[in-house]
Every structure is written in structure tokens, then in C-alpha cells.
């Protein structure tokens, strides 16, 4: 499931910030 903030992306099992 994708539980990231609007400006974050989901990769495998964690979120990362997209710049």
C-alpha cells in the first residue's frame, strides 16, 4: 500500500522524497 506524502514516491516498501 502507498502511505506516502503527496510529494513523496513509493519504492518497494518505503517512501522517498522526489526533488
Curated annotation (Swiss-Prot):
Q: Which family is it part of?
A: Belongs to the true venom lectin family.
Query: Could you list the residue ranges forming a coiled coil in this record?
Result: none
Q: What is the name of this protein?
A: C-type lectin domain-containing protein 1
Main location (coarse class):
secreted
The organism encoding this protein is Daboia russelii (Russel's viper)
Query: Would the keyword ATP-binding be found if you checked this record's keyword annotation?
Result: no
Q: Name one GO molecular function term.
A: carbohydrate binding
Q: Does the keyword Secreted apply?
A: yes
Name the organs or tissues of expression. Expressed by the venom gland.
